[in-house]
């Protein structure tokens, strides 16, 4: 027994059409297939995605996947209808062999896609937060290093001021000592002069007595 045959049509709608019009296109092409005596296996919107290349100035598009079975002639009818629509910017139908695909729950897929997007957003927010924390930590480190450098400089300046003060005090002490020594020398000299005067006076008195 040969594998069953089915067709898979992927078409892309303009990214700027409202959601209700997207639903209208899904319904429209389902009706086209039904009139052509084809059977619809699955009809689901894949969501807005970035295009591999620009199509008619569009960088994004709304992807819709339509799986169906029939005698093959219905494909021409479907693609003719899509070709006449300004909202369809690209379409492609591929003949598939193998087990028929099961109908998927569009709402469930939308929820899954939403969850994935939320997880990605959360991850991006977390990464941005981590980057900010790393930057803040780096800034804090730089501020601390700058503060430490300032403190080291202030400590050095304080030491230099203290050393300068000590040098000044030593110099003042030295000057005081020199002044004292000069004073002592003067006093010794004055005492010596007084003694010499006294001795001269005594000599004069002795001489006068003789």
UniProtKB/Swiss-Prot annotation:
Keyword Mitochondrion: no
Transmembrane segments: none
Superkingdom assignment: Bacteria
CDD domains assigned to the protein according to its UniProt record, in alphabetical order: bS6_chloro_cyano
GO CC terms in record: cytoplasm; ribonucleoprotein complex; ribosome
Protein name as catalogued: Small ribosomal subunit protein bS6
Keywords: Ribonucleoprotein, Ribosomal protein, RNA-binding, rRNA-binding
MF (Gene Ontology): small ribosomal subunit rRNA binding; structural constituent of ribosome
Pfam families with a match to the protein in the record: Ribosomal_S6
Lineage summary: Bacteria, Bacillati, Cyanobacteriota, Cyanophyceae, Synechococcales
Single GO BP term: translation
HAMAP family: Ribosomal_bS6
Protein family membership: Belongs to the bacterial ribosomal protein bS6 family.
């Amino acid at each position: 027994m040969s594998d069953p045959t089915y067709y898979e049509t992927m078409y892309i709608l303009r990214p700027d059409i409202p959601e209700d019009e997207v639903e209208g296109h899904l319904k429209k092409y389902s009706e086209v297939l039904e009139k052509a005596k084809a059977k619809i296996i699955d009809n689901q919107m894949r969501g807005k995605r970035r295009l591999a290349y620009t199509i008619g100035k569009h960088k994004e598009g709304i992807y819709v996947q339509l799986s169906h079975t029939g005698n093959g002639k219905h494909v021409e009818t479907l693609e003719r209808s899509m070709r006449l629509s300004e909202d369809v910017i690209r379409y492609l139908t591929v003949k598939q062999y193998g087990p028929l695909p099961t109908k998927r729950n569009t709402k469930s897929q939308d929820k899954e896609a939403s969850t994935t997007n939320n997880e990605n957003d959360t991850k991006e927010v977390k990464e941005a937060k981590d980057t900010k924390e790393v930057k803040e930590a780096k800034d804090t480190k730089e501020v601390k290093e700058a503060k430490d450098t300032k403190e080291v400089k202030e400590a050095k300046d304080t030491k230099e001021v203290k050393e300068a003060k000590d040098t000044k005090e030593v110099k003042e002490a030295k000057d005081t000592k020199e002044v004292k020594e000069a004073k002592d020398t003067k006093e010794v000299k004055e005492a010596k002069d007084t003694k010499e005067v006294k001795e001269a006076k005594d000599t004069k008195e002795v001489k006068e007595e003789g």
